[in-house]
Amino acid sequence: MNVQAQIENYITGQPEPKRSDMQALHRITLRVSGECKLWFLDGKDSENKTVSNPNIGYGSRTIKYADGKTTEFYRIGISANTTGISVYILGIEDKKYLARSYEKKLGKASVSGYCIKFKKLKDIDIDVLEAAIQYGFEHEL
């Protein structure tokens, strides 16, 4: 199954209203990103054990480890979870930037160094979330 089909299955497998929110968020992220690499991670490790929630990734970045090894990973990710939806904005050097710049304007959301969590899209200002996603695509370590 290709990545597009995996993403579609993941989103349509969500209960409402999370399904509609994930579909809208997927469309927003695709619009902001333009043409980019899509990822789907099922949340399972090499032994097929669940280690995280499944997530959809957008874009590409290179992560360099202390030992000099590198790996490719996504820039923006979205994931449905038991408490709502998480948006991951990776590669921002200033770990306080997201909270400082967006938390007060977002509405009912919690913001960490790389994650924006909310229960439903209707609880937040979508334009502010879109601006944070745009920032994530434009700025990287």
PLM regions with names:
Residues 1-141:
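Charge-dense, helix-prone N-terminal extensions
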